[in-house]
Amino acid sequence: MGTSDYLARMRVEYGSVEKDGSSDLDVDWLGPDPATGWVTLLHQWMAEAEQAGAAEPNAMVVATVDDRGRPVTRTVLCKSVDASGVSFYTNYDSEKGRQLAAAPYASATFPWYLVGRQVHVHGAVTKVSAEETADYWSKRPRGSQLGAWASQQSLPIASRAALMQQLTEVTERFADVEEIPVPPHWGGYLIAAEVVEFWQGRENRVHNRIRVCGGQVERLQP
């Protein structure tokens, strides 16, 4: 079997009102104020993806660009959603941190394959406040805090053993420290919700797409 045939077998037909019981996405799902209604709908869809069995439904694929204008993507975990946008936390010295410093704009996609839905958010990127970072940091498991100190994210390393040695050294360093401080190179980013698009898979690839931009709402052709 050729590769194209193999991939063709993976095709999935999306649902309809009759098939999956979910009504067609429409602009009224955003409520009377789309500028904030998108937040409610995103939370709702995330919860429904979790109920359907999606692993880490807050996972989002974040795209940045490198110094040659080429797109780079990776999956991160969304840690807050409000009218201002969506946030995530990372090492500021990582590849994505360096790229955002040079070109502070990004897009994020929540891909909920189990329920045939996606949400796209894109806009300018800013660092969250030190207070917000400290608050989130304090809620992280101690092991995750140690990992953030141990890893020089995105830099090459000789082996797994070398990485674990760095973790051991950091663990010993903070052995008698009850509250591990936030690393100076670590914190959050907020992707502003300049544009938000909701996508719902439908039969025959005639999907539903609703876009919110600057408080304006429009339906897009699939």
UniProtKB/Swiss-Prot annotation:
Binding residue positions for FMN: R74, T75, V76, L77, C78, K79, Y89, T90, K96, Q118, Q153, S154, W199, R209
Gene3D superfamilies with a match to the protein in the record: Electron Transport, Fmn-binding Protein, Chain A
Q: Which reaction does it catalyse?
A: pyridoxamine 5'-phosphate + O2 + H2O = pyridoxal 5'-phosphate + H2O2 + NH4(+); pyridoxine 5'-phosphate + O2 = pyridoxal 5'-phosphate + H2O2
Transmembrane annotation, as ranges? none
Which Pfam families would you find in this protein's record? PNP_phzG_C (PF10590), PNPOx_N (PF01243)
Give the pathway listed in the UniProt entry for this protein: Cofactor metabolism; pyridoxal 5'-phosphate salvage; pyridoxal 5'-phosphate from pyridoxamine 5'-phosphate: step 1/1; Cofactor metabolism; pyridoxal 5'-phosphate salvage; pyridoxal 5'-phosphate from pyridoxine 5'-phosphate: step 1/1
* Cofactor or coenzyme needed: FMN
Per its record, how is this protein called by name? Answer: Pyridoxine/pyridoxamine 5'-phosphate oxidase
**Which keywords does this Swiss-Prot/TrEMBL entry list?**
Flavoprotein, FMN, Oxidoreductase, Pyridoxine biosynthesis
Q: Which family does it belong to?
A: Belongs to the pyridoxamine 5'-phosphate oxidase family.
Q: How is the cofactor bound?
A: Binds 1 FMN per subunit.
Give me the gene this protein comes from: pdxH
- Give the source species: Mycolicibacterium vanbaalenii (strain DSM 7251 / JCM 13017 / BCRC 16820 / KCTC 9966 / NRRL B-24157 / PYR-1) (Mycobacterium vanbaalenii)
Q: What function does the entry list?
A: Catalyzes the oxidation of either pyridoxine 5'-phosphate (PNP) or pyridoxamine 5'-phosphate (PMP) into pyridoxal 5'-phosphate (PLP).
Q: Which residues bind substrate?
A: R11, V12, E13, Y14, K79, Y136, R140, S144, R205, V206, H207
InterPro entries tied to this protein = Pyridox_Oxase (IPR000659), Pyridox_Oxase_CS (IPR019740), Pyridox_Oxase_N (IPR011576), Pyridoxamine_oxidase_dimer_C (IPR019576), Split_barrel_FMN-bd (IPR012349)
Q: Which GO terms describe its molecular function?
A: FMN binding; pyridoxamine phosphate oxidase activity
Describe its partners and assembly state.
Answer: Homodimer.
Domain of life, source organism: Bacteria
Q: What Enzyme Commission number(s) appear in the record?
A: 1.4.3.5
User: Its GO biological process terms?
Assistant: pyridoxine biosynthetic process
